[in-house]
Amino acid sequence: MSISNITVYMPSVLTLVGIPGLESVQCWIGIPFCAIYLIAMIGNSLLLSIIKSERSLHEPLYIFLGMLGATDIALASSIMPKMLGIFWFNVPEIYFDSCLLQMWFIHTLQGIESGILVAMALDRYVAICYPLRHANIFTHQLVIQIGTMVVLRAAILVAPCLVLIKCRFQFYHTTVISHSYCEHMAIVKLAAANVQVNKIYGLFVAFTVAGFDLTFITLSYIQIFITVFRLPQKEARFKAFNTCIAHICVFLQFYLLAFFSFFTHRFGSHISPYIHILFSSIYLLVPPFLNPLVYGAKTTQIRIHVVKMFCS
């Protein structure tokens, strides 16, 4: 697909290439992507159904897990329908405002997911380090407040990215986005203007969210491990640590994929563009796909209720 050199004033429609360099095989790439999406939808919907129907799971940890499942459904659904439209039906066009909205949803939902992982780490910290006070500290009201703060933090931090693009840029070098979805820097690079402010703010948001969340989760688990290793009985240590395994797995895969995608994009100039696009797409789809599988396999209560549901 050729890219026009004509400067465009306030374009109403943009074009998503998909995966640059792999246009001829995108229809085949769409098959595993669609399978991952369907499994993610089924797994997270099942998780939400179990948590909602079982009163014994109406605890902070599982409420946060339900929030994570809902976020995963929203995140996967914000990119896959359009991506499959590009891969299978050759519908690359997207309205400019719709593209900005998709960008805002994607980055906001990523921020929400990171915030939920912080909330889950805090819950595990209180449950293990202060078990007798857990029920008094993590009240239903506090859970609602934490959930609201997580959503508002992400939405408010990402909103200026949208405003800066809409208000600062009027002329664009091209209307063709070399990506499979509307990502912040992919849109910013189209502008025929100084994009330094947008780049700086984008990095500020990324490092603010990731920096705070990673620090908080790491400190929480340092305290958790200190408390666990001080327990006198081996069985008690194993039981306490076992309640954290699922969260640790989800936390590691979320941030490892995020950092791998970030550093290959920023510093992997020798890497082919289609590798960048593939990894950035996989980074958004793999967590929604893996999270319900990890919690289903590692959390006894969830596993029991899944078996009970299918047996009945």
Curated annotation (Swiss-Prot):
One of its GO terms (cellular component) is plasma membrane. Residues 1-27, 78-101, 163-199, 262-276 are extracellular. The chain crosses the membrane at residues 28-48, 57-77, 102-122, 142-162, 200-220, 241-261, 277-297. Disulfide bonds join C99-C182. Pfam families: 7tm_4. It is a multi-pass membrane protein. InterPro entries: GPCR_Rhodpsn, GPCR_Rhodpsn_7TM, Olfact_rcpt, OR51/52/56-like. Residues 49-56, 123-141, 221-240, 298-312 are cytoplasmic. It is found in: Cell membrane. GO terms for molecular function: G protein-coupled receptor activity; olfactory receptor activity; transmembrane signaling receptor activity. GO terms for biological process: sensory perception of smell; signal transduction. Keywords: Cell membrane, Disulfide bond, G-protein coupled receptor, Glycoprotein, Membrane, Olfaction, Receptor, Sensory transduction, Transducer, Transmembrane, Transmembrane helix. Gene3D superfamilies: Rhodopsin 7-helix transmembrane proteins (1.20.1070.10). Glycans are attached at N5. PANTHER family: OLFACTORY RECEPTOR 52A1, OLFACTORY RECEPTOR 56B1-RELATED. Belongs to the G-protein coupled receptor 1 family. Odorant receptor. This is Olfactory receptor 52A1. The lineage of its organism: Eukaryota, Metazoa, Chordata, Craniata, Vertebrata. The gene is OR52A1.
